[in-house]
From Swiss-Prot:
Gene3D superfamilies: Pyruvate-ferredoxin oxidoreductase, PFOR, domain III. Keywords: Oxidoreductase. Coiled coil: none annotated. It catalyses: 2 oxidized [2Fe-2S]-[ferredoxin] + pyruvate + CoA = 2 reduced [2Fe-2S]-[ferredoxin] + acetyl-CoA + CO2 + H(+); 3-methyl-2-oxobutanoate + 2 oxidized [2Fe-2S]-[ferredoxin] + CoA = 2-methylpropanoyl-CoA + 2 reduced [2Fe-2S]-[ferredoxin] + CO2 + H(+). Its EC number is 1.2.7.1, 1.2.7.7. The lineage of its organism: Archaea, Methanobacteriati, Methanobacteriota, Thermococci, Thermococcales. GO terms for molecular function: 3-methyl-2-oxobutanoate dehydrogenase (ferredoxin) activity; pyruvate synthase activity. This is Pyruvate/ketoisovalerate oxidoreductases common subunit gamma. Pfam families: POR.
Amino acid sequence: MIEIRFHGRGGQGAVTAANILAEAAFLEGKYVQAFPFFGVERRGAPVTAFTRIDDKPIRIKTQIYEPDVVVVLDPSLLDTVDVTAGLKEGGMVIVNTEKTKEEVLEKLKKKPAKLALVDATTIALEILGLPITNTSILGAVAKATGIVKIESVEEAIKDTFSGELGKKNAKAAREAFEKTVVYEL
């Protein structure tokens, strides 16, 4: 089983990203779970969402405390949240950032085995005209992890967002897929 934890801020689409990733894996014949963790969040407050993907039925119903993959939609969270808390040995961190590998590693409390970086915000601004990074970061997830194919991500995005909005979001995911840099540490 692969367990993914998303860290974002209210209004950035972390919950939608977790759901779209689950749908992409489902389209590939996997068993999936996706769910948010809500406190008294408001727009801009830290939000956590989760996705589980497996080849067999998933019976666990708890939050993900020891993720294989951590996805950070908002790089400012690296200063306030321990995004690597519980990260499994051999785990991966995927960050939306324009910073260098060294700058990001300085902010992580635990060094991951792999680090993937992409400037998902710039991609979202260029393609969507908004700094909503949830679909672009999924392109990075597809490239860095290989959990799902980028084509499945694009299809799941188009299932979630209709018409031109779906096409633009799928394009943002593809662009991030192509621009993501993965480091073995």
